[in-house]
Amino acid sequence: MKAKKYENQIYNENGRRCQRHGRRLAIADANGLNTVNAGDGKNLGTATATITTLQSCSVDLNLVTPNATVNRAGMLANREITKFSVGSKDCPSDTYAVWFKEIDGEGQGVAQGTTVTNKFYLKMTSADGTASVGDINIGTKSGKGLSGQLVGGKFDGKITVAYDSATAPADVYTYDLMAAVYVQ
């Protein structure tokens, strides 16, 4: 199936149109975990993210529990924070990619970085726990995430705590969750 083409529209990181010629980029809207920090019961927020410089299929990115909360003390590795799904109605069997856009300067800490005692590190996997995180490079975007073929028009995943925490970290790793569906 060919990717849909959207001419003369480019969106910036805030989801607003830029006045430049080109094709519309796939957009993952209102899906992210942002600024979850000190204190128990902080809500997982939302964000808008633009994706790639490639011609792209439509993409739907949904957090199953967008209002999930985090309790700081006693966080254990693999504790589930939220589930998510990536899908495409017009490209139901093409390639998906979903990744963390790292924005707080910790480098590769989301997926595999060093343990820092005052932070929660988060990781993603498939809903059944079998998929492993790797480097994702889509156009000019990159991060740590998952990639593969959509099955039945979607991919189901989850975000969990990466490491055990014996103490109560003061912060949670901050990132945007981004996704793309495209024809290779």
Swiss-Prot record:
Record protein name field: Non-fimbrial adhesin 1
Keywords: Disulfide bond, Signal
Signal peptide span: 1-28
Disulfide pattern: 57-91
Subunit architecture: Forms a polymeric structure, which disintegrates with elevated temperature into a monomer but with some relatively stable dimers.
Domain of life where this protein originates: Bacteria
